[in-house]
């Protein structure tokens, strides 16, 4: 992935593609106090795995490394998804919304799940008859994976 620019092919009026470069300065980090909302989607299954946030620094680190790096609002620091569990998110593609204040990142998920509660997706609960139920099986044991951290308690 290019370190300075995210490229997106777009259709022009002659129905041919042209390259449109989006730099960090083209993204609107101001709407959410220096952050972008980031939706993470599995490139193979198209399932939404999680939602996180990036600041300009974590966005740049993501472009540099090719792995998703978030900004943690609760810890007030950068964190690469999988730095504790090994369940990293390798960037396949990135898209921005029309306001350029949110990103959709499709990824190759390296590991059995992304949720710190042991699920493939953080969206593992479904509303049924006015109740939230766990609708997915756990894909790993959070106690085993995060035995030396506070991640399980979050």
Positions of predicted regions on the chain:
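Compositionally biased, intrinsically disordered low-complexity segments enriched
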Residues: 1-14
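C-terminal binding/interaction regions
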Residues: 16-35, 43-49, 54-154
């Amino acid at each position: 992935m290019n370190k300075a620019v995210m490229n997106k092919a777009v259709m022009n009026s002659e129905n041919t593609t042209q390259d449109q470069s989006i730099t960090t300065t083209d993204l609107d980090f101001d709407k959410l106090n220096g952050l972008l909302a980031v939706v993470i989607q599995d490139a193979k299954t198209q399932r939404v795995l999680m939602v996180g946030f990036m600041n300009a620094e974590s966005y740049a680190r993501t472009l540099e490394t090719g792995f998703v790096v978030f900004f943690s609002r609760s810890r007030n620091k950068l964190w690469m998804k999988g730095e504790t569990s090994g369940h990293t998110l390798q960037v396949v593609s990135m898209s921005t919304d029309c306001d350029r204040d949110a990103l959709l990142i499709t990824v190759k998920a390296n590991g059995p799940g992304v949720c710190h509660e042991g699920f493939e997706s953080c969206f593992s609960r479904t509303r049924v008859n006015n109740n939230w139920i766990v609708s997915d099986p756990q894909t790993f044991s959070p106690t085993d994976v995060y035995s030396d951290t506070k991640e399980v308690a979050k």
